[in-house]
């Protein structure tokens, strides 16, 4: 068992990744990072984090693709995943609200990257507290 929850943060925006991972570290979490969907999948298999915060739109494979791959793999299917995006409507072809859409495909939640980081930290704590 880990002393602190391990969070994998995945984003192709390096500055945002640095800011978010620093905030999470200072808030009592161990943090690892990945810069694309393939790195995220590999890190998930290797480290089995308690939560993955996954950017939706990245070059190459999308965060949605990576999250679904993680959820379909028997070794990683129980890892909690929450989507990150700064888009008001990350799935423009659906009528579902973004939080509902994330949950409908097996993700824990949707986190708006433009929110105050204290709100993000609280959402992370809330997600980890869920059974």
Residue ranges and their predicted role:
Residues 13, 56-57:
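The short loop immediately C-terminal to the conserved phospho-acceptor aspartate in CheY-like receiver
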């Amino acid at each position: 068992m880990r002393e602190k929850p391990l969070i994998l943060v995945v984003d192709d925006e390096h500055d945002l990744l640095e800011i978010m991972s620093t905030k999470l570290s200072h808030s009592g979490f161990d943090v690892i990072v990945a810069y694309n969907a393939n790195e995220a999948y590999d890190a998930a298999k290797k480290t089995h984090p308690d939560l993955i915060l996954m950017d939706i739109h990245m070059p190459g494979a999308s965060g949605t693709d990576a999250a679904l791959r993680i959820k379909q793999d028997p070794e990683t299917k129980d890892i909690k995943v929450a989507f990150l995006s700064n888009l008001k409507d990350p799935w423009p072809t659906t009528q579902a609200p973004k939080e509902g859409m994330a949950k409908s495909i097996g993700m824990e939640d949707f986190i708006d990257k433009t929110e105050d980081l204290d709100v993000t930290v609280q959402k992370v704590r809330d997600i980890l507290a869920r059974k």
